[in-house]
Amino acid sequence: MKLTCVVIVAVLLLTACQLIIAEDSRGTQLHRALRKATKLSVSTRTCVMFGSMCDKEEHSICCYECDYKKGICV
């Protein structure tokens, strides 16, 4: 009975610690550009090639960066 109570308290304490840590780290992600590039590399969608024509829609779909003045993917 005592051991069960100790285990329950330990689990509750560890759960609380995990929630506190997760809440504190929200919005502090480092290297966002790297994460974006990683997401694009594992994407199953067809991407436009570098130097291809792009606009805001294509840029948001796949192009890493769109030079809107020239209208090309860089």
UniProtKB/Swiss-Prot annotation:
A Pfam entry, by short name: Conotoxin
GO annotation, cellular component aspect: extracellular region
Residues excised as propeptide: 23-45
Keywords annotated in UniProt: Disulfide bond, Ion channel impairing toxin, Knottin, Neurotoxin, Secreted, Signal, Toxin
GO molecular function: ion channel inhibitor activity; toxin activity
Database matches in InterPro entries: Conotoxin
Signal peptide bounds: 1-22
Predominant location: secreted
Tissue spec. comment: Expressed by the venom duct.
Bridged cysteine pairs (disulfide): 47-63, 54-66, 62-73
Similarity comment: Belongs to the conotoxin O1 superfamily.
Protein name: Conotoxin Bu4
